[in-house]
């Protein structure tokens, strides 16, 4: 019976192994946290070129692109740090998960299958805002190009106002699914104004 009991040496060996396994698990948990945090920050950074703060709205398309970037980053970082991450099973799982996430993100961003009326417009508003920012601030010398930029600014501002009105109207009254309903709730006319001068 005494022979069956664990010896002090056995206990020491087992205890010495536990921290090592724990450290390995912590490394992979930190890796996942690093990728997740980076994805959140990348999504937020994509709004850095928004013309004004009110144009920052949820965009499913940008979220899908964040999935693509996160999946790509996970594979690249793992490849460069294989010396730190030595669990083949975990590494294969990360690689396969990243491929699956990349495929899902590609399908969603190209098919737009989950994007409806309101989510489409809320994604288009920050997209239009980029055009306003670049068209207002670009160092343009050619008068023809300047006039084109002004037209773009005015059109994008007008369309942003229209989309914001439509989002509010749909939230309050539901979609106008027929021409009769649409005609009874016409979109107001907005006039976009450019700050840029081409004189």
List each language-model region with its residue ranges.
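His/Met- and acidic-residue-enriched segments that coordinate or traffic transition-metal cofactors
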Residues: 2-199
């Amino acid at each position: 019976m005494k022979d069956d009991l664990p010896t002090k040496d056995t206990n020491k060996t087992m205890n010495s192994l536990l921290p090592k396994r724990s450290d390995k698990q912590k490394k992979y948990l930190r890796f996942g946290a690093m990728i997740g945090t980076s994805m959140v920050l990348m999504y937020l950074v994509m709004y850095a070129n928004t013309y004004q703060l009110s144009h920052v709205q949820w965009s499913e398309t940008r979220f899908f692109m964040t999935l693509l970037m996160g999946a790509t980053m996970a594979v690249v970082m793992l490849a460069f740090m294989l010396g730190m991450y030595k669990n083949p099973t975990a590494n294969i799982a990360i690689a396969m998960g990243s491929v699956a996430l990349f495929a899902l993100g590609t399908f969603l961003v190209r098919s737009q299958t989950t994007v409806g009326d309101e989510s489409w417009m809320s994604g288009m508003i920050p997209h239009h805002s980029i055009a306003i920012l670049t068209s207002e601030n670009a160092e343009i010398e050619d008068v023809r190009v300047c006039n084109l930029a002004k037209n773009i600014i005015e059109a994008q501002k007008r369309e942003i106002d229209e989309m914001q009105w439509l989002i509010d109207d749909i939230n309050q009254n539901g979609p106008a699914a027929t021409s009769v309903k649409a005609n009874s709730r016409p979109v107001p006319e907005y006039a976009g104004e450019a700050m840029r001068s081409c004189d």
